[in-house]
Amino acid sequence: MSTPAVPQDLQLPPSQRAQSAFKEQRRQKLKEHLLRRKTLFAYKQENEMLSSSRDQRVVTSEDQVQEGTKVLKLKTKMADKENMKRPAESKNNTVVGKHCIPLKPSNELTNSTVVIDTHKPKDSNQTPHLLLTEDDPQSQHMTLSQAFHLKNNSKKKQMTTEKQKQDANMPKKPVLGSYRGQIVQSKINSFRKPLQVKDESSAATKKLSATIPKATKPQPVNTSSVTVKSNRSSNMTATTKFVSTTSQNTQLVRPPIRSHHSNTRDTVKQGISRTSANVTIRKGPHEKELLQSKTALSSVKTSSSQGIIRNKTLSRSIASEVIARPASLSNDKLMEKSEPVDQRRHTAGKAIVDSRSAQPKETSEERKARLSEWKAGKGRVLKRPPNSVVTQHEPAGQNEKPVGSFWTTMAEEDEQRLFTEKVNNTFSECLNLINEGCPKEDILVTLNDLIKNIPDAKKLVKYWICLALIEPITSPIENIIAIYEKAILAGAQPIEEMRHTIVDILTMKSQEKANLGENMEKSCASKEEVKEVSIEDTGVDVDPEKLEMESKLHRNLLFQDCEKEQDNKTKDPTHDVKTPNTETRTSCLIKYNVSTTPYLQSVKKKVQFDGTNSAFKELKFLTPVRRSRRLQEKTSKLPDMLKDHYPCVSSLEQLTELGRETDAFVCRPNAALCRVYYEADTT
């Protein structure tokens, strides 16, 4: 049956498949495929031999890997180049490649193209992983990158085998507390605290359970189907086999839980030493890196979790197959469980201790500072300050040096006592000088020197008592009250003593003023009586002009004396302490009030009725008074209706401005200012 003819428009260009070079290429690919099939068959046979013997290992050499890569390069050289034109010598190259690649034995081919995972060859739970299979499509085409990875993997495997050999040659770390293959309690006590019986039994059972599965190996057939993480059922079958092989040892070597010195415990130690002597336990390189990277706490946790997993698988396998021996195996299970529990308690206790030690301990000063800040935020302030200066220095010293010897504290107390006695003696001397009448300046110098040397002496109430007693009796009460306020602000203690002293000073001042007022009233009354008697004795025959001139002369003398006394007071600063009005002189004024009374009107009528006295027409009193500057300034701005009806003059020259020249004035002393006139009379 012939195919229909294709039109020329739809015909494709002639293909290059008919050329000899591409035919040779297809023939080469077929030959490589057959060679790969032979290689896989040889690898399966070798794998069976390795699983049966378990002592042969595949060693890859660098030369063999290079030969394998050369073969792969020749195989992939003409791939995907069907439609490209090649030079004429390509056929010769392929022929040379064909004749240069002889068939190699199956062992060499497997070494060059097959990678076998030799990590942990003694571990029964890990099997070699096949990279190439018959049904895998990737195994039929090997690229350059795959060849490169193959070479690197072979180098890595070679390095791991060398490391394992070095680890095997290294000396084994001795067991702590062991002597001639047995653990001695006295040696353990020499480097750690003695553990409880439960801890000892759990440690012994842990060591026994750790050495038994590594010492006894399962059948080589099962190793190809057993893995550590993924295949759980095969792991359980493997564990049941080695537990069944070592069940006699576990029955013979059953350790007691509560007895310290029993024969069975010695047999446990002997069994442990015997198994550990026969078997060398090594860890793979990956496990080493993990153990080095982890901390001590994480290693304890991982070991405890691994112990728990091992206990679970062991208990399940025993329950499934070895049912006739429940007592011995349950004891082993209990003792193995006790070990991770104790480890967890130890790690938890350690973590708690570390967390407590990591937290900084708060000092008493910090607590006081936080308390004061909280009180300030709430608006609470201490009403009563601390007791004294002396007692405040002691807690600060105690906080800085909490641990001091007995003799140093005694010496500090003696020094503090002497210091307090010295300050108290100084204040008592000042009080004695005040009572004796010593000048104020000397006492102030002594007190100021004491305050310069000891600034905290202001917190003692005796200092403020001395200042209050220095003030003269004639000083105003405001000065005493100001001293009392300063003492309260400084925190003087005890403040009750200061209160009693202030009360005594005020009572003395009030009594002195009362006595002075009585004396001045008596003197004023006597002067008025003398004047009346002199007027009555002279009678109406007295010349009014002479009387007026005498009164004016007397008044001028009095006012001149008063002015001189005021000038002397302003010039003499020491006299300010003795007079009560000097401090308030700037705020007050002394003026003369011009007023009249019915008594004066009657006297005036008598004089006018007599007819002989026609020189003066008005008779008025002239009284010295004290007026406030502040009030005078305010009243001067008021209208005339609200001003005082009795005018006040500041000098005698202003009397002519008030009235006529015929007015007569009688000087009348003021009881409140009678001391001024009393002093003028005495001078």
Curated annotation (Swiss-Prot):
Residue ranges with Polar residues bias: 219-236
Residues modified as Phosphotyrosine: 599
Cell cycle is among the record's keywords: yes
Family: Belongs to the CKAP2 family.
The keyword Cytoplasm is annotated on this UniProt entry: yes
Principal subcellular localisation of the protein: cytoplasm
Inducers of expression: Up-regulated in primary human gastric cancers.
Pfam families cross-referenced by the UniProt entry: CKAP2_C (PF15297)
Source organism of this protein record: Homo sapiens
Keywords carried by this UniProt record: Apoptosis, Cell cycle, Cytoplasm, Cytoskeleton, Microtubule, Phosphoprotein
Source lineage: Eukaryota, Metazoa, Chordata, Craniata, Vertebrata
Assembly with partners or alone: Associates with alpha- and beta-tubulins.
InterPro entries the record matches: CKAP2_C, CKAP2_fam
Name assigned to this protein: Cytoskeleton-associated protein 2
